[in-house]
Amino acid sequence: MRDLLSGFVAGLRSLAPSRFPYRRFALALLLGGIGGWLFVQARLPLPWMLGSMVVCTAAALLRLPVAAPSVIRPPMTMVIGVMLGAGFKPDIVAQLPNWLPTLAGLVLFMIACAIACVGYFRRFGGFDPVTAFFAGMPGGLIEMVTVGEEKGGDARIIALIHSARILLVVMTLPFIVQWIGGVPLGGARASGPSIATTPLFAELTLLACGLAGIVLAHWLRMPAKFLLGPMVVSAAVHMLGWSDSVPPFEIVNAAQLILGVTIGCRFVGTTPRLILRILALSLGSTVILLALTLGFAYLVARVSVHGPVPLILAYSPGGLAEMSLIALALHMEVAFVAAHHIIRVFLVMISAGPLFGLLIGRKKPGADPQDETAGGEGKGESER
């Protein structure tokens, strides 16, 4: 508990005017808001997330003075966790047996993605074995960067590849879902009650779920504690029938805006040349991943009670929060989508290290003749 309080105090200190780039963050929010508004006017899917993401990525590419410091993410991540937990309903336990075929398909899907993407980055990216392995694994960004750096990989390349993957998947998947499922994602009014009409007790209940979830996750040493902890507590409260409150649509829009801004600003501080190269490489890997996603979704749909569209969202190689927000916008079973992404990240997290040791062993990345292409180019770039 002391560590949690220390982290909270450190977070408050980082908000001091001398340490927090308020002007650059305000510009990022302004540009993100303009992007979201433009996407709303164009009736495009998930406008506040995609619009802010596209504009902030362009701003980073143009080297505009934008920034989204990491300290702003935990509070919004907590909100998203509570929001996702609210999608778990009391009847969810009865549906768990129906998830067995889809979870089995998920394991095979992950293996296929890892083999295809690691090989792709080795052959076309010229990455050293360590960097290619952790850039190609379909796991969470933070986990893959942390373990990859420990094993001797280029942490910045791994981070940029996973950031670009999430960027490209989130930008393209809503349109794919709209095209395949005929589901209208854009132009509709946001669902959920307004914050002005939501009872104060309901809002306090959701806030309590978030705070209690952070404490629980810290105590249990859960990964992604600001997301998973609040989601677990909120899910328990909603599954037990103690609350049926859902977040106001203004909070949902704000979550989309902040997510889009933070994803776009991940490329700040990296040269345009490296950004374009990473985006080009990630475009190829994203095509591979989405092709595998569609293929496995349609195959598994034949042996399960779930249709292709929810399976596409459950298997898609995007982030947990981003894919769950898309499911929320589609009025689909958020619990189904979120659970599959949690299991995917968990399985990759516990298996990546041992699998790396089994396949690559103690081989040094510097011994590979292709190292100069990927790691060498990144070494001279400015740090993010």
Give the residues covered by each predicted segment:
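Transmembrane alpha-helix boundary signature
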Residues: 65-68, 86-99, 115-130, 298, ...
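Membrane-interface helix termini and inter-helical loops of multi-pass transporters
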Residues: 90-98, 179-197, 241-247, 273, ...
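C-terminal transmembrane helix pair
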Residues: 289-384
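Alpha-helical membrane segments and immediately flanking helix-loop junctions
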Residues: 124-164, 306-340
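Membrane-embedded alpha-helical segments of transport systems
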Residues: 138-144, 158-181, 292, 320-322, ...
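Cytoplasmic-side transmembrane-helix entry/capping segments in multi-pass membrane proteins
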Residues: 69-80, 101-102, 126-137, 159-162, ...
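Intrinsically disordered, low-complexity non-transmembrane regions of multi-pass membrane transporters
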Residues: 1-30, 154-157, 182-200, 358-384
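Structural signature of multi-pass alpha-helical membrane transport proteins
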Residues: 3-72, 76-92, 197-271, 291-298, ...
